[in-house]
C-alpha cells in the first residue's frame, strides 16, 4: 500500500514481443536452459515439508500450449484475502451467498531457497487455496511476489525487507541473473496453476517506494516485464496486469503506464488502487476521473485491484488522516462508500472487475511501522475478524448483482 516515492525518470528496459509470447529474453542465463520448467513431482514429508523432484524437461509436460487464447472478459466483483487459512468452507459459502465472483490470492516466491528445488510451505498453501476457490467456481486473480518492502526490522527501524521470500542472492537488481530467476519462478507458478488461474497481478504497487525500495525505475520496469514474461511462458493463456496507487504521484504512475503498455506489451489489463477519504484525499467520487485518466493512457481493460474504506469510528493514532466529505466514519459510512464507488465502476464499461481490500479485519501488527496499536492493515474488512457480516457486505452483494446486469447489457 501506501508511501510516496520521489520521481525518477530513468530509461526504460523493454523486453521484446517475442519474449512476452514465450520466447527467450535477452541475457537468459536461467538454469532452465530450454526456457521451460522441468518435470516436477512433489513429496510431502511427515514434517509437512514439500520437496520438489526435478526429473526432466518441461517440453515433455506442457499441455495445450498451442490452444487459442481466450479473450479477456469480466471477472466480476471480488475481494482480496492475504491469509490463506481464511478460505474455509464457511468462508466460501459466505462469499457465494453475497454474490462474490472473484478472489485475489497472493503467491510469494515459490521456492524455499536459491536452489529452486524445494517448494515453500507458503506457496503450497496458497496453491491449495487457489485450487479450492477455482473448483468452487470463483475466478482467482493470482498475485505474484514483489521485490520486498520498506518496513520495520526487529528493532523498529525502517529498512528494506525481503519479506516475499526472494533469496538474497537474487535480490541484486543490477544483475541479469536476478531477472532470469524472477521469470523462472513466475513461470513455475503459472504452469503449476495453469488449470485454475488465468488472471495474474504482477508484483504490487511498483509506483511507490514501499514495495520497490532502492530500485531504480529501469530496474522496476525490467522486474515487471521479466515476471510477466515468465507467467506467459508458464501459461500462454494468462492475462497479466499491474496495480498502481496512481494518484500518489500521478506523473510517475502515468510514465509507468506509458512505458509498460503498448503494442509489444506483456500486459493485458491495468489495475488501479485507491484509498480515498481515508489514506488519500477525496472520496468515492474521486474514482471517476482517476479511471478515465489512466484508461486513456493504457487503452486496456481496468480492474479496480484495491479499494476500501475503514469501518472504525475512532482513529487514536490518526492513521487515516483524510475524511470523505459529508460522511462520519463508521460501518454505515463504509457501506455507503461501497455503494457509491460501485455506481461509478458500473458506469465505466472499461472496468471488468473489482477487488475490495480486504475480506476481513485483522489484529496483525503493522509490518511497516511495527507499532502494535497501528491499524494501517487491520480495519479494512468487509467482514469482522470472526467472519460476521458488516453492512458493507450487504451493499457489496447488491452492487455485485447490478454490476453483472450492466455488463450483460454491453
Language model features: what each stretch is:
Residues 16-19:
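C-terminal motif of bacterial Sec signal peptides marking the signal peptidase cleavage site
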Residues 67-181, 201:
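N-terminal substrate-binding region of glycoside hydrolase catalytic domains
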Residues 80-84, 108, 145-147, 205, ...:
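Active-site beta-loop-alpha junctions enriched in small/polar residues
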Residues 116, 122-123, 155-267, 278-289, ...:
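Active-site cleft segment of glycoside hydrolase catalytic domains centered on the general acid/base Glu
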Residues 260-321, 342-346, 351:
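Glycoside hydrolase catalytic-domain groove-lining segments
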